[in-house]
Amino acid sequence: MAGNRREFSRRHSLAQVNFRFLFHKECCMSEKSNQIAGASSFTDENTIPRRQMLAWLATGSVAGAALLSGMGRANAQTAAAVPAGKDLEPTGATKLAALTAALAATRRHRKFKKVPMILTHPDQWDSAALDLLLHYRGSPKQVWDNTDISRPWLNLMRNSITAQVWSFRNADFIAISATHGTCHLALYDAYVWEKYNLPAVLGHKFKRNTFLDIPAKVRNASAADYNDPLGLFSPSANCLPLLMDRGAVFLGCHNAIWEFSGGLLAKGHNPDHLTHEELAADLTNHLIPGVVLTPGIVATLPLLTMAGYSYAK
């Protein structure tokens, strides 16, 4: 048990060192102008490793405050929800750790002005991040077809990761959420939930995006005590941030964004009087940190299965 604690501490210290390097590297990178589909030049805070960023935020440092300010209130909800210093990827998961670092350092497209109904160029989605997932060499690999937000979709993913890691000892196992349908609403930040009144869209079953909340009872739980019935690997930990900290990846769906934006327009939920292309861009720009946007989930699923991911529903 003591050895596990030392390993978690060692990995977190290394993560903080890597953050300083990657943060400097990212700040020095020049932005490219993107002429595709009316998109402006883009950058994204997600290129900074999320776990290291949260460690800075927790210290109250000037750099951390600047990052939080740049993220905006909505994305700050996601950041503030994650217990600083928690590294929940299993010990020995070298391939998963490398993938997580590569994904964190990969730029996302989040400053669109307009997006079309059908995406026709890789610059319009997170193609580099998706390629990393398609070429991941760890195993086993599983993709969950998640559509219904009322189902225990996060619980199923958590159970799968837990049994793979602790029972079958597959440290490099990865679970991906192929997110569409109403589940896709969980991938929007607080800005979208407030601006477009998503609680009403979901029949007031949720007052806000509670999928980003980490319950208080697990915040101080030990990552070393994996059998704690109320701990970080228990049903109490069914939330997006903790699953992401365990290496899970959530795919976004442009088709779901386009169709949902059309539904908002039809119902008059368009406070800024945007066009369909502009409203879809607004939703795209406010996906939570860490999401990998695809041109369409049902089209991406065959690519994932061809790449060795087992389909689960």
Language-model features: locations:
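C-terminal segment of N-terminal export signals and the immediately downstream linker at the start
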Residues: 68-126, 130-133
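Acidic/histidine-rich, surface-exposed loop or edge segments in extracytoplasmic proteins
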Residues: 130-147
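N-terminal export signals
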Residues: 33-46, 52-78
